[in-house]
Structure formats: C-alpha cells, structure tokens
C-alpha cells in the first residue's frame, strides 16, 4: 500500500518523499533492492523512471507545461492531475461521504479520515502518522537532514516546496495577485488570507463569546482567555519543580519566558538541559485554489488544502494518539536528576503553537520568536513598566499585563480563588519580585542588542530581522533595484514599488464600511478603522500614552530620549523626524512648492496654504464666543480673546455660579445693551471712542461697574472696514487752546454820516459757548473775507469781513469796510486749521435723534446780502495797509461775550447809544441724518431759534441757480449751502428768474448805546432769513418761504472735503 501511495504522490508530495518512499517505504514493509544510483547525490532507485524524475530535481528541468497557465511539471502524471484542476474533473469519489478527488491517491488519503488508521510510527518518539510524506518529514526533524540547498544562499530546506517558496526571495516573484487591489503574494494561502480584508470574512468564531477571527491561530489563542482546555502544543509533560509551585499564569510560553527574565536565578546550579529538539520551520504551501481542505490535523482539527501544508504544519499530539511506552515513567524524576533524552518525547514547550496572536493589536505570528519581536513595539523592554492594580505583579510588557489581568476577571466572575498550577497552561515560579541583591538595570545598549540582534556596521542602527538590515544597507549604498516602469522612480524594496504604482493606477481598493472613505493602502485603512473604534494598541512604556500605529509611538519616544537623529547638512540643526528636516531645508533652498491658485503667493507648507486660502473665502471656522467675530486660525482667536479682558486683571479662578453668569473681566463685553446706535465714518482710519447707550438688558454685576464705553480701532480689511476692540486706551488729548477774543471795527476810511450801527450776528465755535464776535457793517454792507491784521505781530491769522452786496441807506452801513481785530496780544490769537479726515484721532458720535430740520422765522425788515470774497486792500484805524490772503478757514473761534467792545464810532460820538443786545451764534456740527453723517452750519437767532444749513461741494449748478461772477483766484469750485431737509430746490419760476440770496432782517434802532471811546456804535440785533432773490420786503410772507440753496465759490477746495 505504501508503494501505491508513493507512486500516486510523486508530483504532489515532495520529491524527496517519493524518493524516500521508494528507498524506505516505512517500517512495516521491507525496502526493495536499489539498482539505479544518482551521480549527483548518490541516492539509489529501483526503477530508471524514478532516477530520471529525481535527476530533474538537480537540473531544474520541467518539460511538461500546462497549456492553460504558466505552470510546468517534471512528470506527465503531475501535468495530468493539474489539468483536472482547470476542467473540474474529479473522478474518484469517497463511498462514505460525497467528496470527490482528482487522483486516486488523494482518495486513499481521505479514506484514512474515516478509518483513523495511522500506519507510520516513528521509532524514536513513537508518534504515528497517516501519510508517509508526513512520516518522512518527521524523520528529518530527528536527523536534521536538509537535502534541498538554495543555490543563491547557504540556506537548506527539508523539502522541495519549501525551497521553491524560498527562491521567491531572490527572484522577487509573487505569482498570486489580488484581483481587487493588485497586491501580490508568494503563496496562495497568503492570498486567501489577504482577501478576507476586502470581503470582511471572519470564518473562525469563538463558541464561548461572539468574537470572530480571520485566522484559526487567533481563535485558538483567544480561547485560552476563557480558561478552556489547553490548546494543542501546550505543556503536557511534568514541568520543572520550580514551575509546579503556585504562581502567575500566562497565556503562552513567550509571555512566561519574558516574565522570567527579571527574576533572579535559583541558588543551586541548574541541571544540564536536554539536547534542544529540532523545531521544524513553518512555511505556508502554495496549493491549488480549487482543492478543498481535505487534509486535517488530528491534534488541532485544522484543515489544509494539500498534503505539503499539513506536513509543514507543526504536528500536534491529538486525543486519539496511542499511548506511547516512553511517554511517562512510573515515577517522576527528581529535581537533581536530568531527564532521559531518548525515552521521552521532545519537550512540548519547545514546539510552537499553530499560531501566536498579539493581544493588544490582534496580529498573528507563526513562531514565538516572531511574536516576541513584535511585542517589543508595545512597551519598554527590560524593567517593570506595567504593574497590576489587583496584586503585586509587574510586567515589562503591556501584553503580559493584559493577559495577567484576565485571571483576576475570571476569578471575580466565578467567585473562586486563583487557579492553581496544575490547572494552568504555563506556570511562573512564585519568587520575590525584588531579590536580596538588587539587579542593576541593563545598560541602554543591552535591550537594543537583545531585541534587535542585526546591527548596521556603518551607523550602528539595529534591526529585529535580517531583512530590515538588508533594506537599511541599501540606504548607505544607494541601491534601488526596483524601478517603476511608468515614471522611472526606483525603490529599495518591491513592496514600496507596488505601493507606488497605485499612484499611477489610482486604485483605492480598501473601503471603510462606516463612512465610505477609500484608501490605496491597507495600513492607511487599518489606521482609519481605529479612528472609528478609538483603539490605540501601542502604548508608551514611559508615560503610558497610547497611539494608533507603531510609527507614532516611535516618534513619541524621541520626546523621552531627546534623540534628534536627522541633522541639517547646512546649519547643523537636528530634528526628530525626517519630514521636519525636509521642511527645514526649504529655508536654505528657498523652495516654496505650494502655490495659491487664486493669487501668486507661495508657501513652504501645505498647512500654510490652506490657512491662506481662507482669506479668499468667507470661511472663518474659529468664532469668538463673546463678539461673534470669525478667524481663520485658532491662534488668531486666542490673541483676539485677550482684547476682551483688561491687561492688568488676572482671569477669574472661581467657579462660576449656576446660570449664565460671565466672568468679571468680561462682564461688560459679554452682555451688550439691548440697543446700540453706532455710526462710523467709512473712510476713517483712527481710534474711535464710542459712547454706547445702555438698554434694558444688563449683565449681572460681579464687581465694580465697568465704564459703558469701549475704544475701537477702525481697520481696512478685505471685507471692508471693521471695528476691532482695543485694550490700550488712547492718550488723553491736550486741552484746546484758549480761543482769541475778536471784535470787528470799522476801518479808518469810514464815511461820514450819523445813525447807529446795527448789531450783526456773532460766530461761535463748538469749543466756546457764550463767546462771540461783533460784526459792524461798512458803507458797502456786510461781506466775508479773510484778512491779516496789520497791527498783530503774529502772521497767518485768519479773519472774517462782512460786506454788503447792494447799496443801502446812508449811515454807518455805508462804511468802506470793517476790520476784525484781536482783543489780546497777537501771539495768543490762534488759527483754526482743519485737518484731513484721516488725521482725526478721536470722533465723538452724536445721537441719531438730533434735530436736523430748519425752522424759518419771519422778520420785519429784509436786507439782502451775499457771501463772497473781497479782493483788494482794507485800511484800519492805524492807517496801515492790510494785505488780503486766501482764507483757510470757515469757522473762527472767538472769545467770551463779556469782553465785547461796544460804543459809538469815531464820527458818531454823542449821536446815540449803542445797545449790546444778544448776538447771534454761527457754528458747524457733524450730525447723523437720513443721508448719513453730514456737516451742518448752525445759525442761532437772537431769540434762541436755530437754523441748520448743510454744506456740500458740487461741480455744476442744479437747475434754477446761477453761478456768481468769478471774483476769486482761478481754480475755485462751487460750495452749496442748503437747508438741512433739502427736499425742495428753488427754480426760476418760483422766484421770477432771480438768484437765491441770503437776507438779513434788521429791526429799527432801539436807542443810543455807550461804549469805549474811539469805537463805533454797536449795531442793533439782527436775524438771518433765507428768502428767494427779487422779492422785496413784505412781498412774500416768511411762513411760505421754500427751501433754497445759496451758491458761493471758495478758493480752498480741501476745506470742503473735511466736512
């Protein structure tokens, strides 16, 4: 039967198995005579066909190629069986179950599942096998024979399939490609396991809880946490005496070995250990995908798709294994007696389990060494970094602590004491954690050498595996053997090339089932899944902070070690990450690779570009909770929040009371009043002090009442002018200079005549209430002119002279002119200079409810006057010439009213008395009207009534108004003074074709007045009335006067713009 099995397994079993079967068919059958010997290796065969088939193993010849796929075979029978895999033909059916097979040998192997026959028994350890290929492979574990060497490296293997898989390392061949993401693998089993990432299949379910797993090894390791029966491969022989004492329990042997390291060694010398058993290498076979899992391990019930996979699977002693005579002696050996190596089987602890999974992150490994290397990434090696809160145990790894704490959870749930050693899988001897002689901590290089044995000779960097060192050496040599065919970019490993090629294909094969995001790479996909689950399996051994991947943990460790391995070659500055170094090098190179698509600005970082792009849009994700302003950056918001609190007031540290009670420093800013009337000039760029009227809604008082005012800064932004609160109070403005005290005197060339002078209006600025100027009419009437006083020592004084337009009655009004003379010394006379609007530093906004209407009052007499400049020279009482100059002012500040001079003129002494009376006010105000902020000329009558006139500049006259004769210098523009409502304009039809004029209403004289000698008599009180031109006194009643405009040219255009 063994010959048939060997012959039928010539292609599927390893070549050495067939050869060995012909050479040594098994202990139950005698070996046939060997007639044909191989000249290469000396092996002998009974048939020439076997020798020919064997020689193709040395030459690598595979003459039989499949027409449907690239596979080739050494024998025709292997090709025949392989083609049945394409056609689906399975002519051999099991009589006990519905399964069918493509070759008779597979059926015979399958029949052993039903019969349970184990015909091949090992003479050294007594293990029994169902198949000869497993038996031959097992014999090589005892002999250490590896007859299949690699021609490219010194490695050797126990069967040809393992050698073929190893050859892929040198050739880079990955024949099994995923149809979804294009990732390729060297073995079909790896491809099937990978495809579960896309399908979400988790076929291995725990019978004790609803958890599912993608690998059976993960399930087996998980079942140990439930306290189930010991999994295959766990300790079955009697442990050493030290381990039989009650102690800590671990899930797998790797945790125990790592836990034993901090313990001090026992005082007596340890007995010599038995010879180390030969542990088979674990590899996954490249089986055909159409074959079902017909090969099942009797120890762990794990199924395999081919005999080679089952052969490579670690043999597990099953419950149906026959008792071995050498299994256990009648009496357990003593502690000082070494166990007999031959009669006993190899120590089971040395045989790894089918798979080892990392508890924190779920990764699985085929060997204990692989799991041990991986677990160093979860915690600090050496030292007791993790301590159990339920007992005094401490562990160097987080995984060990998690496995240990599961024991306490099970004990609490069952209400029983901790499990004893005989019920445990792996037992730790209970020794004191702190030995009598404290063990000094290992040097910093010791853990690295223990955990990372492969060290680079160039830079001293260490690695866990030889492949990591090999890839690292390519950084020093610059070797990039894997080149992209699309763009020519080269990489040091094939996996990096496969990842890079997705940039050209755009394939995003990994899709999140919760949010629908797709990813190109599995690592990004796994990291994204942890964002949903909140899982952070990688914990820092120093501070306990956890991370989602190992790279973040490695970068974080630089914080504790202070390591900055990446140094700049230009300035020597070092960095913890290569990305920071690349960004820093742009400072030296001037590279700014990130360009804004909306403007020519460039940036060195993509984050700066994203922040800049918010300035082009209305996006302001960071909003102030106090005033509602938005900002593009959180730093800008934090800086803005400081403006709401006074700089010298510390933030409140008391707990806020229940309810909407803001902190004390921000009480005034958090609770604005119910209504605010704030009007800001749109062109002003200055510090504004806004007085805000309080409403009904008031903030709760938490301290001294804050002033109901706030200083703002008006700033021009892309969205327009914005008010920004300023915590810096503006300096107190200096007090205004004392206004000059002026009086209008008739010139020395005054004509003869009697009569009393009429008292005209007075001009008053906003700064001086109750101050005034006396206007004396001359022979030519009243006019407006700017002149400089000849008697004044100072220069640049701006004066106002009134002159009549038309001739009037003989008397003081017909004097040639009047002169504005200061009452104080000339240095004290100040000139009012109006600055441009952008130089105004403080603006006091008036309430919007100010009166803006014009009330026209009737008068008894009408005198027509027109405002115009006067050219030429004027004479004064001293006889000196007064040179006229272009006026720079519209308003003249005057002194107090009590210092006004009154009395008869030089030629009027004794003719009558002049009465002081109440003079009229003239001032400018900035008022809020329906049309916005406007400058208004306010005329106050003798009886306290006010008339407001608006001032504006125009290029052309409106209909119905005629331009006066140009008497001033060239370049004059038009200034319109109109009533504040300005709802109607006077046209020629309303006035009979005349021109709009300004009239003075002069009442009859009230009697003589006394005054200083040498001064003319003061005129009587007058009122200003706006009437249409051409209308005589008494022709039109004052109540029916419409709103009109007065046109006057002024040479100083910039003065108009200040209002």
UniProtKB/Swiss-Prot annotation:
Cited Pfam families: zf-C2H2 (PF00096)
Location in the cell: Nucleus
Region (Disordered): 226-247, 260-280, 312-351, 644-674
Region (4 X approximate tandem repeats): 818-864
Listed Low complexity bias regions: 228-237, 323-335, 644-658
One term of GO molecular function: RNA polymerase II cis-regulatory region sequence-specific DNA binding
Gene Ontology biological process terms, A to Z: regulation of DNA-templated transcription; spermatogenesis
Keywords from the UniProt entry: DNA-binding, Metal-binding, Nucleus, Phosphoprotein, Repeat, Transcription, Transcription regulation, Zinc, Zinc-finger
Alphabetical list of Gene3D superfamilies matching this protein: Classic Zinc Finger
UniProt source species: Homo sapiens
One annotated Gene Ontology cellular component of this protein: nucleus
Residue stretches spanning the membrane: none
Name this polypeptide is given: Zinc finger protein 628
Biased composition (Pro residues): 263-279, 336-351
Zinc fingers, C2H2-type class: 36-58, 64-86, 92-114, 120-142, 148-170, 176-198, 204-226, 356-378, 386-408, 454-476, 482-504, 510-532, 538-560, 566-588, 594-616, 622-644
Complex and partners: Interacts with TAF4B.
Sequence repeat intervals: 818-831, 832-842, 843-853, 854-864
InterPro entries: Znf_C2H2_sf (IPR036236), Znf_C2H2_type (IPR013087)
């Amino acid at each position: 039967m063994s010959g048939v099995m060997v012959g039928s397994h010539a292609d599927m079993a390893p070549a050495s198995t067939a050869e060995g079967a012909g050479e040594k068919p098994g202990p139950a059958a005698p070996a046939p005579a060997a007639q044909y010997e191989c000249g290469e290796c000396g092996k002998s065969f009974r048939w020439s066909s076997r020798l020919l088939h064997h020689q193709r193993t040395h030459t690598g010849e595979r003459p039989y190629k499949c027409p449907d796929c690239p596979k080739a075979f050494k024998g025709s029978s292997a090709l025949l069986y392989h083609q049945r895999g394409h056609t689906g033909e399975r002519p051999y059916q099991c009589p006990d179950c519905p399964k069918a097979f493509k070759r008779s040998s597979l059926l015979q192997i399958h029949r052993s599942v039903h019969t349970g026959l184990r015909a091949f028994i090992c003479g050294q350890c007594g293990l029994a096998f169902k198949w000869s290929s497993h038996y031959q492979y097992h014999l090589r574990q005892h002999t250490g024979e590896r007859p299949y060497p690699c021609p490219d490296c010194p490695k050797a293997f126990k069967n040809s399939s393992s050698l073929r898989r190893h050859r892929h390392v040198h050739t880079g061949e990955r024949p099994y490609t995923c149809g979804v993401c294009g990732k390729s693998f060297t073995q079909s089993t790896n491809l099937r396991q990978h495809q579960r990432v896309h399908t979400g299949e988790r076929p291995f379910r725990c019978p004790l809880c609803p958890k599912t797993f993608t690998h059976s090894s993960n399930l087996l390791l998980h079942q140990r946490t439930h306290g189930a029966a010991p999994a295959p491969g766990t300790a079955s022989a009697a442990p050493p005496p030290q381990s039989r004492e009650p102690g800590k329990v671990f899930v797998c042997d790797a945790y125990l070995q790592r836990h034993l390291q901090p313990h001090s060694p026992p005082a007596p010398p340890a007995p010599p250990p038995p010879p180390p058993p030969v542990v088979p290498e674990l590899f996954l076979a490249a089986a055909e995908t159409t074959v079902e899992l017909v090969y099942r391990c009797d120890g762990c019930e794990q199924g395999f798709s081919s005999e080679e996979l089952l052969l490579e699977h670690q043999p597990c002693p099953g419950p149906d294994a026959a008792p071995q005579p050498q299994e256990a002696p009648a009496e357990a050996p003593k502690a000082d007696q070494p166990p007999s190596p031959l009669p006993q089987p190899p120590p089971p602890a040395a045989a790894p389990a089918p798979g080892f999974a990392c508890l924190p992150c779920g990764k699985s490994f085929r060997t204990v060494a692989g799991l041990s290397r991986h677990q160093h990434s979860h915690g600090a090696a050496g030292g007791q970094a993790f301590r159990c809160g339920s007992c005094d145990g401490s562990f160097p790894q987080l995984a060990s602590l998690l496995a240990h704490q599961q024991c306490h959870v099970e004990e609490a749930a069952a209400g029983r004491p901790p499990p004893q050693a005989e019920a445990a899988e792996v037992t730790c001897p209970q020794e004191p954690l702190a030995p009598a002689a404290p063990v000094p901590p290992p040097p910093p290089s010791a853990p690295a050498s223990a955990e990372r044995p492969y060290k680079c000779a160039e830079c001293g960097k260490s690695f866990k595996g030889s492949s990591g060192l090999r890839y690292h050496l390519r950084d020093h040599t610059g070797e990039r053997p894997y080149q992209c065919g699309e763009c020519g970019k080269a990489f040091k490993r094939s996996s990096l090339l496969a990842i890079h090629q997705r940039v050209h294909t755009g394939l995003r094969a990994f899709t999140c089932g919760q949010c629908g995001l797709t990813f190109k790479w599995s690592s990004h996909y796994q990291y994204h899944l942890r964002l949903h689950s909140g899982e952070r399996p990688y914990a820092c051994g120093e501070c306990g902070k956890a991370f989602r991947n190992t790279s973040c943990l490695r970068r974080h460790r630089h914080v504790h070690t202070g390591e900055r391995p990446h140094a700049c070659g230009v300035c020597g500055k070092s960095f913890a990450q290569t990305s920071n170094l690349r960004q820093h090098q742009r400072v030296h190179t001037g590279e700014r690779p990130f360009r804004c698509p909306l403007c020519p600005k460039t940036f060195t970082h993509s984050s700066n570009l994203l922040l800049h792009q918010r300035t082009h849009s209305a996006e302001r994700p960071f909003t102030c909770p106090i005033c509602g302003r938005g900002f593009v950056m959180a730093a800008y918001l934090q800086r803005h929040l400081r403006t709401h609190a006074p700089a010298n007031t510390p933030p409140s540290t008391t707990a806020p009371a229940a309810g909407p009670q803001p902190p004390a420093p921000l009480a005034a800013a958090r609770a604005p009043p119910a209504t605010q009337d704030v009007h800001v000039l749109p062109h002003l760029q200055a510090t504004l002090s806004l007085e805000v009227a309080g409403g009904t809604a008031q903030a709760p008082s938490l301290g001294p009442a804050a002033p109901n005012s706030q200083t703002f800064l008006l700033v021009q932004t892309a969205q327009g002018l914005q008010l920004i609160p300023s915590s810096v109070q503006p300096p107190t403005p200096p007090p205004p200079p004392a206004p000059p005290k002026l009086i209008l005197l008739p010139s020395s060339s005054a004509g003869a005549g009697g009569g009393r002078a009429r008292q005209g209006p007075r001009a008053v600025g906003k700064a001086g209430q109750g101050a005034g100027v006396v206007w004396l009419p001359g022979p030519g009437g009243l006019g407006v002119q700017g002149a400089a006083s000849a008697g004044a020592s100072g220069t640049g004084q701006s004066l106002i002279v009134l002159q009549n337009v038309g001739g009037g009655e003989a008397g003081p009004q017909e004097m040639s002119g009047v002169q504005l003379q200061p009452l104080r010394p000339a240095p004290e006379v100040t000139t009012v200079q109006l600055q441009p609007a952008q130089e105004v530093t403080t603006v006091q906004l008036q309430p919007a409810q100010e009166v803006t209407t014009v009330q026209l009052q009737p008068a008894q007499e009408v005198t027509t006057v027109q405002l115009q400049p006067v050219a030429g020279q004027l004479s004064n009482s001293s006889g000196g010439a007064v040179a006229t100059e272009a006026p720079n002012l519209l308003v003249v500040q005057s002194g107090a009213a009590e210092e006004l001079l009154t009395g008869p003129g030089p030629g009027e002494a004794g003719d009558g008395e002049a009465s002081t009376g109440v003079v009229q006010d003239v001032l400018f105000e900035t008022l809020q009207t329906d049309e916005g902020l406007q400058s208004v000329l306010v005329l106050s009558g003798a009886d306290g009534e006010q008339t407001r006139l608006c001032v504006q500049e125009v290029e052309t006259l409106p209909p119905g108004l005629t331009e006066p004769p140009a008497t001033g210098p060239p370049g004059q523009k038009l200034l319109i003074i109109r009533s504040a409502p300005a709802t109607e304009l006077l046209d020629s039809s309303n006035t009979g074709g005349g021109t709009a004029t300004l009239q003075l209403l002069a009442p009859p004289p009230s009697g003589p007045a006394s005054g200083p000698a040498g001064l003319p008599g003061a005129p009587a009180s007058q009122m200003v009335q706006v009437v249409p031109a051409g209308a005589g006194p008494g022709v039109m009643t004052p109540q029916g006067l419409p709103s009109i405009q007065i046109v006057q040219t002024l040479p100083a255009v910039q003065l108009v713009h200040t209002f």
